[in-house]
């Protein structure tokens, strides 16, 4: 197997970017992940111990190196083969590989680059299929449907998690027990433990890219999102985790939880920008606009108080746009679409495209955008209706319909949908999917025949907390 191709590329920016099933994935990993060069891998046993160690160390270091986005197709294929070879060696050797990771962040770099190349290849393949103009590349891609396949990538991640027993270790730590007692021969090794841990973050990312947002959050059941978590030691992993958790919450209409996630990471970045002056931080800071765009969307759906730092930055970046989002109506639609396009991840399709019928291939981004915009249109008139309802304690449906110039029955249906939308699940404890149903609006109403009963519960601002918070910042 040839060495991993990296083309001498410098660090790239961050991309714009079941237990039974896990056991089955681990068992059939060897026969499902196919690649050329197996004979060469088997010859490693005949090498001297020094040569073998040097070769593996070089492959470990190479696996974390970024691949040029514009690399030719054969280089992308070779990169996939090299990853398969490396992961096969790590997972299927006779016993655990006795090697230490080159650095504490190496495992994250490997998983991050592995998923980045998978994401880039899928987007590239889908684009070639939709255009249908390059016959040579189409033929090459048609003959290799399993290269950078969704199943293979998920198989690697699940296998690393299962082999390292990382979920069992994290669960033991939650119970204040010794994780090494359940780690086993593989999980006790730093190489497997770190790869398994960051594979969980990788699964969050991949499931989100595939559009399965609930499964994305489910993968983090054993990871506690706090400053003591292992991912918080690596800035890029920290940022990525909160971005994808927040985005998954947003797509599940849990806007309060999404705002909490986005706020955490944006405040963290703003407070550490003077202490982290490196290429990694620079690449992350360039994605801040995406984070602010997403939080602007969430605040439009779920008006709430924000941290003063975020609120100020949001007004500076999206002043006029933010006002239009909050007013709703047809003029807000293009702004929602623009912000979503600029801030969403690069979605991918779980299956190879149809090269014979290019017109049948749907852009995954357009698919998720249409779902999102349907939700926007459902809530489009919410600010306008609320502005009328706030003026009354009781109101006739026909009267409100006259103000809005719509049919009473159409308005009745909208009011029922809007009331259902105002009930959100908000996280309280345990897993990220858990929580309790709360009323997300300060305005509530009930319908009795044609009569609307309105109640408003507005919590006054706690001035003491505000003064204490700002005094702490000043001094």
From Swiss-Prot:
GO terms for molecular function: translation initiation factor activity. Residues 257-451 form the PCI domain. It is found in: Cytoplasm. Its main location: cytoplasm. Keywords: Cytoplasm, Initiation factor, Protein biosynthesis. The keyword Cytoplasm applies. GO terms for biological process: formation of cytoplasmic translation initiation complex. GO terms for cellular component: eukaryotic 43S preinitiation complex; eukaryotic 48S preinitiation complex; eukaryotic translation initiation factor 3 complex. The keyword Lyase does not apply. Component of the eukaryotic translation initiation factor 3 (eIF-3) complex, which is involved in protein synthesis of a specialized repertoire of mRNAs and, together with other initiation factors, stimulates binding of mRNA and methionyl-tRNAi to the 40S ribosome. The eIF-3 complex specifically targets and initiates translation of a subset of mRNAs involved in cell proliferation. Belongs to the eIF-3 subunit L family. Component of the eukaryotic translation initiation factor 3 (eIF-3) complex. This is Eukaryotic translation initiation factor 3 subunit L. It comes from Botryotinia fuckeliana (strain B05.10) (Noble rot fungus).
């Amino acid at each position: 197997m040839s060495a991993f191709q990296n083309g001498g590329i410098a660090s790239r920016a961050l991309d714009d970017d079941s237990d039974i099933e896990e056991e089955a994935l681990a068992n059939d990993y060897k026969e499902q992940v196919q690649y050329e060069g197996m004979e060469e891998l088997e010859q490693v046993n005949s090498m001297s111990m020094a040569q073998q160690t040097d070769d593996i160390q070089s492959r470990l270091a190479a696996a974390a190196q970024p691949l040029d986005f514009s690399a030719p197709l054969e280089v992308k294929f070779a990169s996939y083969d090299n990853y398969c070879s490396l992961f096969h060696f790590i997972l299927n050797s006779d016993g655990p590989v006795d090697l230490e990771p080159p650095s504490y962040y190496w495992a994250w770099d490997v998983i991050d680059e592995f998923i980045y190349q998978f994401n880039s290849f899928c987007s590239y393949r889908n684009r070639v299929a939709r255009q249908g103009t390059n016959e040579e590349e189409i033929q090459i891609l048609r003959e290799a449907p399993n290269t950078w396949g969704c199943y293979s990538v998920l198989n690697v991640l699940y296998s690393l998690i299962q082999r390292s027993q990382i979920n069992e270790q994290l669960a033991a730590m939650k119970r204040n027990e010794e994780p090494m007692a359940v780690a086993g021969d593989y999980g006790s090794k730093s190489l497997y433990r770190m790869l398994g841990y960051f594979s969980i973050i990788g699964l969050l990312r991949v499931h989100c890219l595939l559009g399965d947002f609930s499964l994305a959050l489910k993968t983090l059941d054993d990871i506690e999102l706090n400053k003591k978590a292992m991912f918080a030691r690596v800035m890029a992993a920290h940022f990525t985790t909160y971005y994808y958790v927040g985005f998954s919450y947003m797509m599940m209409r849990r806007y309060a939880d999404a705002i909490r996630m986005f706020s955490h990471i944006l405040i963290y970045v703003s407070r550490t920008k003077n202490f982290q002056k490196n290429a990694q931080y620079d690449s992350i800071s360039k994605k801040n606009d995406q984070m602010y765009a997403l939080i602007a969307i969430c605040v439009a759906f779920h008006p709430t108080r924000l941290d003063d730092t975020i609120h100020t930055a949001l007004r500076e970046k999206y002043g006029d746009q933010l006002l239009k989002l909050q007013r709703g109506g047809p003029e807000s639609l293009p702004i929602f679409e623009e912000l979503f396009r600029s801030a969403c991840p690069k979605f991918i399709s779980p299956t190879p495209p149809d090269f014979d019928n290019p017109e049948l291939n749907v852009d995954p981004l357009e698919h998720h955008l249409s779902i999102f915009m349907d939700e926007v249109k459902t809530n489009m008139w919410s600010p306008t209706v609320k502005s009328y309802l706030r003026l009354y304690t009781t109101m006739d449906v026909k009267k409100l319909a006259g103000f809005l110039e719509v049919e009473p029955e159409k308005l009745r249906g909208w009011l029922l949908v809007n009331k259902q939308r105002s009930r959100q699940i908000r996280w309280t404890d345990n897993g990220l999917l858990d929580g309790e149903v709360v009323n997300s609006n300060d305005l509530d109403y009930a319908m009795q025949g044609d009569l609307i009963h309105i109640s408003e519960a507005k919590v006054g601002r706690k001035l003491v907390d505000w003064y204490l918070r700002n005094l702490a910042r000043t001094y």
